[in-house]
Design a protein with these regions (language model features):
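Structured, non-membrane catalytic/scaffold regions adjacent to prosthetic-group chemistry
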Residues: 2-201
């Protein structure tokens, strides 16, 4: 059985006002927003692959992934459409565990999903205990509407960077814009700097 640890985030002692990025409003609900139809991927057909810039790769089945050490991060999430949800509870695997399985010197990574969605990220933003591959939300398996069976969780960036239905990470030497980034969204997406669209500082 996989071990459990709480992750580096916990319930913050800061006031809710201090935790709300500019231009955001708090919500108790969990809105569903997607770029296209919702894929339904059975866990017996699910796999996750990390590929280096040289083509070397490491893959995990569902059983192998859920047997890895598990963390339970409690984090605030912020959508580019201006809602924020505080103290969301997840369970999954630190991306440090998965990315350490391949040797890479690349500075960038592209997250790739089962529906063809992609999003680009600096390598530094998915390592150092700040990002996860999660499969449970609030104590229950993650539903397809919210990215199940597994999605990325990168809470310090706008939530479009936390790719739903994710199937892998591909390291790249050059920065390769993803789906929303090519459509005009900001390349990085820091909610505290309101980096919603291309051209925002």
């Amino acid at each position: 059985m996989a071990s459990l640890s709480p992750g580096f985030h916990g319930r913050s002692s800061r006031s809710l006002v201090d935790r709300l990025p500019p231009g955001q409003y708090p919500t108790e609900s969990f809105p569903v927003l997607s770029a296209g139809p919702t894929p339904h991927v059975p866990t017996e057909r699910w796999s996750f692959t990390v590929t280096s810039e040289t083509g070397a790769s490491r893959s995990w089945t569902w059983e192998e992934m859920t047997a890895l050490p598990q963390e339970q991060p409690v984090v605030d999430i912020h959508c580019v459409t201006r809602w924020s949800k505080f103290d969301t509870r997840w369970q999954g695997v630190s991306l440090d565990v998965l990315t350490d399985a391949v040797r890479t010197s690349a500075d960038f990574v592209v997250a790739e999903s089962f529906d063809g969605y992609t999003t680009n990220l600096p390598r530094a933003d998915i390592t150092g205990g700040r990002a996860w591959l999660v499969h449970s939300f609030d104590g229950y398996p993650l539903s397809p509407d919210h990215g199940g069976p597994a999605r990325l969780l990168i809470p310090h960036l706008y939530f479009w960077k936390s790719a739903k239905w994710v199937r892998g990470l591909r390291f790249t030497t050059d920065n390769e814009p993803g789906f929303w980034e090519r459509a005009g969204y900001h390349d990085y997406g820091d909610p505290w700097r309101e980096q919603r669209y291309r051209g925002d500082l």
